A protein has these predicted regions:
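Short beta-strand element of the alpha/beta-hydrolase
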Residues: 83-87, 92-103
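Gly/Ser-rich "nucleophile elbow"/oxyanion-hole loop immediately N-terminal to the catalytic nucleophile
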Residues: 143-187
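Acidic catalytic loop of the alpha/beta-hydrolase fold
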Residues: 270-275, 303
Length: 333
């Protein structure tokens, strides 16, 4: 604990978790007793919903080497969601890359075209890729982060996480995709979503989060470790703090990492004050020895790691996608 004083008067008290021996870092878990049952039931419910993929070629974004499609899929509760699918024209099988979006309605932005990799960029807000169906004025899904937090069953994140698995259903079903070489990545919110998907679905073979949000949601509420995505102001009326934190525990990315089976390469800015780096370190501690490499920029913030560290991250990603080799160059434990 750091205490700042002016004479006898205490100006500020700060307390934080400091990890100095990551390979031996033992951390607690907020995972509820029925966590695995909750998600097994959710995914069983998803299996009852037909995939119903609709693919529309987008001429504007397509090139001589890549066909770009707008994809609409059916998610939990028969609610649709969209994504960009980029299919190279070269003969497969080709590696697959599932890309999770940063926060906000304006993500995922444009498609991620590649001449050598099939990419699927998912939109998780439930609106189409051009936002042409976003109504004027207030709408519940415009504030999807806090929608339905009254209970785990009604939380928007239940639908969102199930949609990730449904997106993987689509990507892994494409005949040109090498089912033995699928990666999932994302930055900020997308980094947290990538960890969640890797925990829920074992069809990917490597996960590459950057500056991930969504680990240790309880800390963001109680201790202000990063300001995204929740504060106590998101607590539904009439709930206690304990009830609110119990709901969040079903969607905390740190509670999924123990189930991740593939290698993980994580880009971290240690001075990240948006999605605090300590939250991610806590989540990564649940990964097994030899399974994780953290690329840590000591002076990097949120999305602002130096080119040196970004290049190390890209090297690992390309090593897996382009050369079908393990992405881990130097394990962190």
């Amino acid at each position: 604990m750091l205490i700042v004083r002016s004479g006898d008067r205490i100006l500020r008290e700060l307390e934080w978790t400091f990890t100095y021996d990551f390979p031996n870092y033992q951390t607690e878990s907020t995972r509820p007793d029925d966590f695995k049952e909750f998600w097994a039931n959710t995914l069983d419910e998803l299996k009852q919903v037909p995939l119903k993929p609709e693919m529309k070629l987008n001429q504007k974004w397509s090139t001589d080497t890549v066909d770009v499609f707008e994809v609409r899929l059916m998610g939990l509760g028969n609610k649709h969601f969209w994504g960009w699918y980029c299919r190279p024209k070269k003969k497969g099988p080709l590696p697959g890359h599932f890309i999770c979006p940063p926060t906000g309605l304006y993500q995922p932005g444009g498609p991620a075209r590649s001449e050598n990799v099939c990419t699927f960029s998912i939109a998780i807000h439930g609106f189409d890729l051009h936002l042409s169906d976003v109504p004027p004025g207030p709408h519940p899904w415009k504030s999807y982060h806090t929608l339905g937090l009254e209970s785990p069953d009604t939380a928007s994140w239940r639908w969102i996480y199930a949609s990730l698995v449904r997106g993987m259903d689509f990507l892994s079903d494409q005949p040109e995709v090498d089912s033995n070489r699928i990666a999932v990545s994302g930055s900020s919110q997308g980094g947290g979503l990538a960890l969640v998907l890797a925990g829920l679905d074992h069809r990917m073979h490597a996960v590459f989060p950057q500056y991930p949000g969504l680990p240790r949601l309880d800390w963001t509420v109680k201790h202000n470790t990063g300001y995204w995505p929740f504060k106590m102001s998101a607590k539904p009326k009439g709930q206690t703090e304990q009830q609110f934190l119990k709901t969040l525990s079903y969607f905390d990315a740190a509670n999924f990492t123990a189930d991740v089976q593939c290698p993980a390469v994580i880009l971290v800015g240690l001075l990240d004050w948006v999605t605090a780096s300590g939250n991610l370190v806590n989540a990564a501690a649940h990964l097994k020895p030899g399974q994780v490499q953290m690329i840590c920029d000591p002076w990097g913030g949120h999305g602002s790691a130096s080119m040196t560290y970004r290049n190390r991250y890209r090297q690992s990603l390309n090593q897996f996608l382009q050369h079908n080799r393990s992405p881990i160059i130097k394990p962190s434990k």
